[in-house]
Amino acid sequence: MKTFSAKGNEVKRDWFVVDASEKVLGRLATEIARRLRGKHKAEYTPHVDTGDYIIVTNAEKVIVTGRKFKNKMYHHHTGFPGGIKSASFEKLQDKNPTKIIELAVKGMLPKNPLGREMYRKLKVYAGSEHPHTAQQPKQLEIEE
């Protein structure tokens, strides 16, 4: 019996919509990353992007446990000397709530060209509306 290897152009990709309201950030991000990679499919192949498209709505209502709401820090560098910038979870959620889920999922994907291709299939929206109704996304329930 030969080992099956999926071809990139033969993979069937579905669209799923996830409601992030009252979901724990890490548990939500791991399931999203798993589905973006395609690990939930029988035809998963490590060197081929077999994942689905994921639309995340209500990103502003995602929660974190413990004291992370005040203590969790996000850092980035501007590229200039002394240009390290920091923001707490609380401030980032007020300023750009979609960035929180994007950063959490991006950190769980491979750091290579294939990982960037997987990341492009993630669509995050702060509110409950999204412009992807033409793709007829299926509702995806993620347990707590």
UniProtKB/Swiss-Prot annotation:
Keyword Signal: no
One GO molecular-function entry: mRNA binding
Keywords: Ribonucleoprotein, Ribosomal protein
Source taxon at top rank: Bacteria
InterPro entries linked to this entry: Ribosomal_uL13, Ribosomal_uL13_bac-type, Ribosomal_uL13_CS, Ribosomal_uL13_sf
Family to which this protein belongs: Belongs to the universal ribosomal protein uL13 family.
NCBIfam families: rplM_bact
Functional description taken from the UniProt entry: This protein is one of the early assembly proteins of the 50S ribosomal subunit, although it is not seen to bind rRNA by itself. It is important during the early stages of 50S assembly.
Protein name: Large ribosomal subunit protein uL13
Originating species: Legionella pneumophila subsp. pneumophila (strain Philadelphia 1 / ATCC 33152 / DSM 7513)
